[in-house]
Amino acid sequence: MAAKKSKTKSKPKSTPRSGRSMHSSTILPVGITQMTCVEDPRDNVKKQLALIEQAAKAGAKVICTQEMFTSQYFCQCEDHRFFSLAESIPGPTTDACCRLARKHGVVIIAALFERRAAGLYHNTAAIIDADGSLMGVYRKMHIPDDPLYYEKFYFTPGDLGFRAWKTKFATLGVLICWDQWFPEGARLTAMEGAEVLFYPTAIGWHPSEKKEYGIAQHESWETAMRAHAIANGCYVCAPNRIGREFIAGPDGRPVSKDGIEFWGQSFVSAPNGQVLHRASTNKEEVLVVDCDMDKVEFARTHWPFLRDRRIDAYAGMTKRFGAGV
């Protein structure tokens, strides 16, 4: 599927924990990972499980993977071959994650390509509690269709809505990649009680556009999610993949001469929008960041955006366009 495989030459970097120490019971150490993906899903799963274990040993209590970590980003083209990469949930990968969660007593959010039924596929995240139980799944609601991001060919939009998960350590919300551009999803998930929002992601540059648009594209991406943190008074965590991926078409040649250069820079934002830690653009990393959960209620009472919502005036939000158009 890829022109050539990427290889990890050294152990992925484990970033020192950011934030206050664990002396306070309100501290939640959150782990996010970023890595390259290669053609063989078995190699990707093996690497991802190792990174999850590394995060757990570094003290993380909630750990989230990047979007569709089991494969390369095959959505650069529309090709029926790639449906074979999907798997059921529960399935072999989520079973392995459940065992790891139970072994280390951690919550795991595992994002992968789901085969729900014959002809029905989703871009999905499995939520696994610290006892190893599969709590359920979130299915990506907003599905893009842009050059080299042809997801509508593969994924049926999610039908489970936006919800929060009361795990052992905190109430968590999960959305996926393209969802991050829509404030409605973040707001509805926060209204369900989420204290931390996770956005497993696969986003990068078209290399030919990077010089002109690259900085602005990345800043827009990060700013959108930091705004969700501010507007909803919660932490936001966005694990992204790295590496340049070329996907081969049926003729064996790359469908794009440039591929996609995934920009990494996974990050954690505080409820005030401050970036607590940001990963590199090109290194496999494990970030473990201490999140003070008291700051969620502090933000929501000092910046009372949830209090001041005018729900009586928002009926138009459920319309495709305004009455004056």
Where do the language-model regions lie?
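C-terminal beta-strand edge segments of enzyme domains
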Residues: 3-5, 14-17, 21, 25, ...
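N-terminal active-site segment of His-dependent metallophosphoesterases
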Residues: 15-61, 198
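Active-site-proximal beta-strand elements of phosphoester/diester hydrolases
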Residues: 27-39, 124, 137-140, 164, ...
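Short, glycine-anchored, charge-dense loop/turn motifs used at functional sites
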Residues: 30, 127-135, 267-276
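Cys-nucleophile CN-hydrolase/nitrilase-fold catalytic domain and related Cys-dependent amidase chemistry
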Residues: 41-42, 49-139, 146, 203-234, ...
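CN hydrolase (nitrilase-like) catalytic-core segments centered on the catalytic cysteine
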Residues: 86-109, 177-285
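Short beta-strand scaffold segments in enzyme catalytic cores
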Residues: 110-112, 124-127, 163, 266-268, ...
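Cysteine/selenocysteine-centered motifs that mediate thiol-based redox chemistry or coordinate metal-sulfur cofactors
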Residues: 162-195, 296-325
